[in-house]
């Protein structure tokens, strides 16, 4: 791909709750990225299995992806690996 799909992790209080209780991670992604491209990029970059991707275009003009990981992968462990906290 000539552009990066994932820009950076999206860190908010809601994102932390999703990570703790629903095994989800949130990312700011390129506005041209499809759900499939986001899933492939997350699986490739972070070596996890993605179950579902939901996307949202924010009022700020960014595109946000909420990625649910499989039960075999721990969102908190992945977040600590990528430097969220």
UniProtKB/Swiss-Prot annotation:
GO terms for molecular function: rRNA binding; structural constituent of ribosome. Keywords: Ribonucleoprotein, Ribosomal protein, RNA-binding, rRNA-binding. The keyword rRNA-binding applies. SUPFAM superfamilies: Ribosomal proteins S24e, L23 and L15e. GO terms for biological process: translation. The keyword rRNA-binding applies. GO terms for cellular component: ribonucleoprotein complex; ribosome. Gene3D superfamilies: 3.30.70.330. It holds the Pfam family Ribosomal_L23. Part of the 50S ribosomal subunit. Interacts with protein L29 and weakly with protein L39e. NCBIfam families: PRK14548.1, uL23_arch. HAMAP family: Ribosomal_uL23_A. Binds to a specific region on the 23S rRNA. Located at the polypeptide exit tunnel on the outside of the subunit. Belongs to the universal ribosomal protein uL23 family. This is Large ribosomal subunit protein uL23. It comes from Haloarcula marismortui (strain ATCC 43049 / DSM 3752 / JCM 8966 / VKM B-1809) (Halobacterium marismortui).
């Amino acid at each position: 791909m000539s552009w990066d799909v994932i820009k950076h992790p999206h860190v908010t209080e809601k994102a932390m709750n999703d990570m703790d209780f629903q095994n989800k991670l949130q990312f700011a992604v390129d506005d041209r990225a499809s759900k499939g491209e986001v899933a492939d990029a997350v699986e490739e970059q972070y070596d996890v299995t993605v179950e579902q991707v939901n996307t949202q275009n924010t009022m700020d003009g960014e595109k946000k992806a909420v990625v649910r990981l499989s039960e075999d992968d721990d969102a908190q462990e992945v977040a600590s690996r990528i430097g969220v906290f």
